[in-house]
């Protein structure tokens, strides 16, 4: 834009003298022409001459303005060139500074990378050492856990076997209880069906009675009409009434009679409905009582079962404690039962150290009870059943004459009672159905009295037969 302005200024400046020369030539030509006009006949008017002078003045003014603009544009161009030079210098300095900063940053990062590599190598070495240590430690713990797992699995199998046997007994008992409850439920259903049939029969009998009364009333009405000498075309009935009556009085009398009859029948119907509603309410009340009784008996049965389970649990705990006491007593007897054998000779017997004769029967227990230990706390419930001291006593034989109380005592029948079957809920019905079959016999496990731990009986001391002299 500045270049085009400068070109226009130069053109205008270059064209200024030419225009002036052309104008001068024109004026001279005009003057000459004036002289020649006089000679040649060409005349320039003064109006045209004034117009040309005005145009020349305007062109000169425009030329001055364009020259001023050219000067301003030249100044602007110089300022822009200086500014461009300054910007180039600033860019060179900024680039040099950026290169210095980049080199400094690269050096610092290289140092940090070297430090991190060294730290990484040290960490790798430490990690390998720690990993090796942890691997050895974990392998040792794994072997220990495997041994413990094998032992626990063995104990668990024994406990599971004991629990399975116990649960099988409980399942059999529950199956027997379920069968008895199903039989009771079937009996209640049959009783309900019988009650419904009885109710239907009573309703049918009531309807038949009402129909008989209606027939009887129709017959009485027919007799009364015959007595009054009224023409009876057909026996009037509530279902078939003849509306053809001779006089209005007979009609009114007949209407009053029918109204009275309807009122009486309505009263009978209301009484029958009231009686029926009372019976239904009574039956519903009986059914509600039976349901409540059934629910109460079920809750009582549940409480008895829970109580029986609790007592069985306490009994098993007491049996385990008795077994431990018996084992402890047996160990003490076997360890402290060294006394001389009683002989029949009056001469006192002095055993020699080289004699291989056993001193007393208690001494022979040592070979059997060396490896005997009371059960641990982990398998106290299950192992005591299998490692009971009764097994050692049976192994010793009956020649020693030791009598020990059995750890699993059979309860006497006077301490336990069999649960009686629930009474029939249909106690208010007139017809008593046959009682439900008793539940299958169960093992007595629930004492009737409060759960009391039976006192352990003291085992009898071994009796050694002594011959009289």
UniProtKB/Swiss-Prot annotation:
Compartment(s) where it occurs, according to its Swiss-Prot or TrEMBL record: Cytoplasm; Cytoplasm, Cytoskeleton
Low complexity bias (residue ranges): 344-361, 460-469
Gene Ontology cellular component terms for the protein in this record: cytoskeleton; cytosol
Residues in the signal sequence: none
Record keyword 4Fe-4S present: no
Acidic residues bias (residue ranges): 1-10
Sites of Omega-N-methylarginine modification: 380
Sequence repeats: 99-127, 128-156, 157-185, 186-199, 200-228
Tagged with keyword Acetylation: yes
Residues annotated with Phosphoserine modification: 45, 233, 237, 242, 247, 277, 316, 356, 360, 388, 406
Span list, region 5 X 29 AA tandem repeats: 99-228
Sequence motif SH3-binding, residues: 435-444
Residues the record lists as N-acetylalanine modifications: 2
Sorted UniProt keywords: Acetylation, Chromosomal rearrangement, Coiled coil, Cytoplasm, Cytoskeleton, Methylation, Phosphoprotein, Repeat, SH3-binding
Region Disordered: start-end pairs: 1-37, 335-362, 394-469
Chain positions found as Phosphothreonine: 342
Skewed-composition ranges (Pro residues): 419-444
PANTHER family, sorted: COILED-COIL DOMAIN-CONTAINING PROTEIN 6, H4 D10S170 PROTEIN-RELATED
Swiss-Prot/TrEMBL domain comment: The protein has mostly an alpha helical conformation similar to myosin heavy-chain tail that might adopt a coiled-coil conformation.
Stated name of the protein: Coiled-coil domain-containing protein 6
Organism: Mus musculus (Mouse)
Gene: Ccdc6
């Amino acid at each position: 834009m500045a270049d085009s302005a400068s070109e226009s200024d130069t053109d205008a400046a270059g064209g200024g003298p030419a225009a002036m020369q052309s104008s001068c030539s024109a004026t001279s030509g005009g003057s000459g022409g004036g002289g020649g006009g006089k000679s040649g006949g060409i005349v320039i008017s003064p109006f045209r001459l004034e117009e040309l002078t005005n145009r020349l003045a305007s062109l000169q003014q425009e030329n001055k303005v364009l020259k001023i603009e050219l000067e301003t544009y030249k100044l602007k161009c110089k300022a822009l060139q200086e500014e461009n030079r300054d910007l180039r210098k600033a860019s060179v300095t900024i680039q040099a500074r950026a290169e210095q900063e980049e080199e400094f940053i690269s050096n610092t990062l290289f140092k940090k990378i070297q430090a991190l590599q060294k730290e990484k190598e040290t960490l790798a070495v430490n990690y390998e050492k720690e990993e090796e240590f942890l691997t050895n430690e974990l392998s040792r713990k794994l072997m220990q856990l495997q041994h413990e797992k094998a032992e626990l699995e063995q104990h668990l199998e024994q406990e599971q076997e004991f629990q399975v046997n116990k649960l099988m007994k409980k399942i059999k008992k529950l199956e027997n209880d379920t069968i008895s409850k199903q039989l009771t439920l079937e009996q209640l259903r049959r009783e309900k069906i019988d009650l419904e049939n009885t109710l239907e029969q009573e309703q049918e009998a009531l309807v038949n009675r009402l129909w008989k009364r209606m027939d009887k009333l129709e017959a009485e009405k027919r007799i009364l009409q015959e007595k009054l000498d009224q023409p009876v075309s057909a026996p009037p009935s509530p279902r078939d009434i003849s509306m053809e009556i001779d006089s209005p009085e007979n009609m009114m009398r007949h209407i009053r009679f029918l109204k009275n009859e309807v009122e009486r029948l309505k009263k009978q119907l209301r009484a029958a409905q009231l009686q029926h509603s009372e019976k239904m309410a009574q039956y519903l009340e009986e059914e509600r009582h039976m349901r409540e009784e059934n629910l109460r008996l079920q809750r009582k049965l549940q409480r008895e079962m829970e109580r029986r389970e609790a007592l069985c649990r306490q009994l098993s705990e007491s049996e385990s404690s008795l077994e431990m006491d018996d084992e402890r007593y047996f160990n003490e007897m076997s360890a402290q039962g060294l006394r001389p054998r009683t002989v029949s000779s009056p001469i006192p017997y002095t055993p020699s150290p080289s004699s291989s004769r056993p001193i007393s029967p208690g001494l022979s227990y040592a070979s059997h009870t060396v490896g005997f230990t009371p059960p641990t706390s982990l398998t106290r419930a299950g192992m005591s059943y299998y490692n009971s001291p009764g097994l050692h006593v049976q192994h010793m034989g009956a020649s020693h004459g030791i009598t020990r109380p059995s750890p699993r005592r059979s309860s006497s029948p006077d301490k336990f009672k069999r649960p009686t079957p629930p009474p029939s809920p249909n106690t208010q019905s007139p017809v008593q159905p046959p009682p439900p079959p008793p539940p299958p016999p169960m093992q007595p496990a629930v004492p009737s009295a409060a759960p009391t731990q039976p006192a352990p009986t003291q085992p009898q001391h071994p009796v050694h037969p002594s011959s009289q002299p």
